Amino acid sequence: MNNNKQPKQGNFVKNILMWVILAIVVVVGFNFFFSSNQSSVDKISYSQLMTKLDGNKIENVTMQPSDSLITVTGEYKEPVKVKGTNNFPLLGNSSSEVKNFQAYIIPTDSVVKDIQNAAKSNDVKLSVVQASSSGMWVQILSYIIPMLLFVGIFWLMMGGMGARGGGGGGNPMSFGKSRAKQQDGKTSKVRFADVAGSEEEKQELVEVVDFLKNPKKYHDLGARIPAGVLLEGPPGTGKTLLAKAVAGEAGVPFYSISGSDFVEMFVGVGASRVRDLFENAKKTAPSIIFIDEIDAVGRQRGAGLGGGNDEREQTLNQLLVEMDGFQDDGNSVIVIAATNRSDVLDPALLRPGRFDRKVLVGAPDVKGREAVLKVHAKNKPLASDVDLHNVATQTPGYVGADLENVLNEAALVAARQNKKEINAADIDEGMDRAMAGPAKKDRIQSMREREIVAYHEAGHAIVGLVLENGSTVRKVTVVPRGRIGGYMLALPDEEIMQPTNFHLQDQLASLMGGRLGEEIVFGVATPGASNDIEKATHIARSMVTEYGMSKKLGMVSYEGDHQVFIGRDYGQTKTYSEATAVMIDDEVRRILGEAYDRAKEAIETHREQHKAIAEALLKYETLDAKQIMSLFKTGKMPDEAAAAEVPEPKTFEESLKDANANVDDFSNINIYNGDEKTDSKPEENKEKSEDETAE
């Protein structure tokens, strides 16, 4: 898409340069014409004229009254050299031989008589012509015509820019025009079938589609379709895709624009663009206006420090006016907006009559994730061992964009190994890469560091296996990825929407298992548990201040109002005293201390299993759920896994050789090796579940 735009932008720049060069050439030529005519005449003063007459150097003289002066022209008997000047210093001055002269004198009787006497005494032919007013106009035109030419060329240039750049894109003279991209709904290929994992959300939008197709049915019943639909939810859940599907199903014009496109540095531009957008939508009604990231323009007015009457607020005011009652005579314009920050939107924007319907587009459940995976796997050849349902169960909290990224990473891994199909191992690697980044198998680690990491992860696994409300341990690995040295993936047997206090307490104990695995075996503590401590502290504080799970403090909310604007809570006092703050800290420490003791008891009671899992991690690097359970119960690996060996990490040259093994001509092929060097910028650890622990 970008490649298609580059030639247009190149031609656009070339056209501008052509117009500028043409304007300069015309102005320069016009001035050169006048200056060349003027430079062919020797301009002299009255005293010089009298000297040349007395010196018998003049052939003839002509006197012509002009305004308040008399123009004296004539010819020399012999050409004289004069230094010419032009209006463009860069061209420099030049000298030339001229035969004509010109002088301006004051029309007094004495001056005229002196010239006549000098001409008569030297036999110089003297003639007088009638006064002419054309000289003044020629001089005026010499200044006006170049200016008019320049303005005309500039106007044509601006018109060409407007024709190519559209209403608000390339034309500087139309800042107030909307930058919305219009798409014909009849040619849109996106349908509700392309949106998976959002069945309830699609059902909410079916009425909007039906109204756009059959408005009479609703008008006859006196029903009013929602003037606006607000799609809110985390990034990557498919809000924009849902809006496109509505336009595709309804078959009406679709105007899409980002909230940031309304506001510019010039005053009044945002409000003007809002008016222009709705005027265009009304002309093609019924139609849909989609505003992506509406929080960029719809934030609360007067919020935070310096929240005065700025340009963004003027744009919001105009948007509020346009959205209030523009459905008349069946010509409906429906506004669909998307945001992941609905908490910062202005209340006037959310009231009934503007955004009547609010659709929460959240992360899909296991059934929805499986449906999303099936949609994204349509164009990917999957091997027979790939179970998309199993992949869906291992990706809680993943949204549509994350799931698409997992399959894409798996396809890249398979392509790197010259496979024809994507197998389960590729999917597993794709999940690891999407969550924690590429593996760093050739990272230099001492044996002691590897042992500490292995016992750390084994500690997480043991606590998760022992506790009743703990999640099922699905995977443990000590392969470094990004900034982490390893991780343990624990998932619940079924998705829990409302975890109990027992679930949270067991989760805290599982988070403590990593640090205890280091302390019990080696008697040391490493920074690898910093992420565990951070998450555990957040959960414990939420239990005390938000969930009311502390018997000492009771069911009281202490930190429920989190302001998002700078300065909004400045000067506001806390709703609890200093003594209560001390009690909150004491309760958080107590809950974390109890979790620490429970985790310590679980590991010390199962020291043999802890050691068996850690040694298996040092040997095999990665263990799945079946292997972990076998080690916990029998202390041994399953038979089919006992013979497996950990492959040595390949060098970049070896990977390049394998990738090019079946390629005849690879001179223009770039091979990407995701596991090549440890000094590459590590990817951030992507936390997908409260039960995942990463160090």
Swiss-Prot record:
Its cofactor is Zn(2+). Binds 1 zinc ion per subunit. Residues 657-695 are annotated as: Disordered. It is a multi-pass membrane protein. CDD domains: RecA-like_FtsH. The active site is at E457. Zn(2+) binds at H456, H460, D532. Residues 1-15, 161-695 are cytoplasmic. Residues 37-139 are extracellular. The chain crosses the membrane at residues 16-36, 140-160. One of its GO terms (biological process) is proteolysis. It is found in: Cell membrane. Keywords: ATP-binding, Cell membrane, Hydrolase, Membrane, Metal-binding, Metalloprotease, Nucleotide-binding, Protease, Transmembrane, Transmembrane helix, Zinc. This is ATP-dependent zinc metalloprotease FtsH. It comes from Lactococcus lactis subsp. lactis (strain IL1403). The lineage of its organism: Bacteria, Bacillati, Bacillota, Bacilli, Lactobacillales.
